[in-house]
Amino acid sequence: MPHTDEAGKAPRRPTREEIAVVGLVPLLEPFFRGPVVRALMPAQLRDAMETHGLTPRHGAVLPQLLAGEPLSVSEIARRLHVSLPTASELVGGLSRAGIVERTEDPANRRRILVSLAEDFRAPLEDFVARRGEPLLRALDGLSPSERAGFLAGLSAWVHEVQN
């Protein structure tokens, strides 16, 4: 179903300039496909993912954990825009693979906190660095104001897709 602001209203037709921008998006898609992703993934992480039948949806949890403190399953669900049962299932698979660890929140024993297993921190950091190289090279060529504009546009797009 096309994204519309109002139910039943057809989406607006893009301008020629907008068509040129939208036309760039499919050119990025192969970079996010399985073979390219697997080639960039460190062996330890790739083996754990493949051995335990983990999918890109499981992989989407990992950068969230790399960036900071342990997260609750509810916070993971919120960030990934998935249901709580789905987030719980994703965390369960990652936990069985040994990629993440689950612990009780000392402040609330009913709440489970999820963190990246230390053995997988360095491989995941390497993977994120490899995946980010083309983007970081592109950003290097932009002025600070162009970077700010790029970030604003990308953030707005993510917001639209997720809402």
Model regions and ranges:
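N-terminal leader segment of winged-helix/HTH proteins
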Residues: 1-53, 116
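Short, flexible segments with low predicted structural confidence
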Residues: 31-34, 47-49, 66, 92-93, ...
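Ser/Thr-centered flexible coil motifs
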Residues: 15, 55, 84, 117, ...
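N-terminal helix-turn-helix DNA-binding core of bacterial DNA-binding proteins
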Residues: 38-83, 97, 113
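Terminal interaction helix/tail motif
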Residues: 2-3, 13-31, 122-163
